Amino acid sequence: MALAYGADAVYLAGSRFGMRASAGNFDRRQMEKAIALAHGMGRRVYVTCNTLPREDELNALPAFLEELDGSADGLIIADMGVLALARRYAPNTKLHVSTQMGVINSAAACALYEMGADTVVLAREASMEDIRKIRANTPKELRLEAFVHGAMCVSFSGRCLLSNYLTGRDANRGECAQPCRWSYSLMEEKRPGEYFPIVEDGGTYIMNSRDMRMIEHIPELLEAGIDSFKIEGRMKSAYYAAIITNAYRHGIDAALRGEPLEPVWLEETEKVSHRPYCTGFYYDYPGQHYAQASYSTRADVAAVVESCDGEGNAVPVSYTHLRAHETLRHL
């Protein structure tokens, strides 16, 4: 879906070593088909190898890396040891440093470049000014990538132990339960079953993060030196991938032509389920503007379209029934 709606590349996970353990990840045969499909469209596939593996997992890495060498367009890596192993066992594949590695300065970026990295996905905590300075002090051959849309983590670039502590599911091994996005109530020890809402207007909203949206700031990101934009897509619906990818495709193309963003594409990003949007750490520290907890969406799926008639009009094959007084707007 992402490729159909304008993505230049997609990232996906194999059966192991990916940061979405509960997702329907790709086995070897599915991976081969996905890579062939993307390459047939002139697009690229980056395979995630971005968990922090434990000692007893290292023996499986060489075979995993050798299997992908020369077929995947890049490997996304979050561990220094895995980066070294990838240079040895996947010498024909470009190496991308994951945002999980927390790169936030030029010294780290240069060191990783010397270790063989082709691309560094900067930490979400990097500001616009940080990016400008990193670009000015790194080799031009090193590509810089940045997340521009998706969830914000309460910990530094996703290195969080909250999920592990509360559920036994390790966020650093692809099993995050996202407890930072749960709704919590307070129960007093001697009043079991009585739950009190937590209201703390004078305190912290760290467990209540917003979603990042940078579609309005694409020209500035390009000017700062970002070579590619990354959208959170795994564990999202096909609808989400289509809507958000399409909006950013038009936003990027407009920026490259020197044209302003059309309001319709900003409006499109409101049509998926999301938390209130913010610009992350790009311009300042988010601080206390994490005040609203609920997800929101301003649109429902009204029909599924699988074909067009001879005049290019959509032919819906299934419908969602509208309730009384609801309207459907044709775009």
Model regions: which residues?
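Active-site-adjacent beta->alpha loops and helix N-cap segments on the catalytic face
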Residues: 23-32, 80-86, 125-138, 238-240
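Catalytic alpha/beta core domains of metabolic enzymes, predominantly
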Residues: 94-224, 241
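Anionic-ligand-binding alpha/beta catalytic cores of soluble enzymes and soluble regulatory domains
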Residues: 130-133, 142, 232-292
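Active-site beta->alpha loop and helix N-cap motifs at the rims of alpha/beta catalytic domains
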Residues: 25-89, 94-99
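Conserved small/polar residues in nucleotide/adenosyl-binding loops
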Residues: 320-327
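Hydrophobic faces of well-ordered beta-strands that scaffold small-molecule active sites
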Residues: 10-12, 45-49, 75-77, 95-99, ...
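Conserved, mostly hydrophobic/aromatic
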Residues: 2, 79, 112, 146, ...
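Glycine-rich, proline-tolerant flexible connector loops at the mouths of alpha/beta enzymes
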Residues: 11-29, 49-56, 235-239
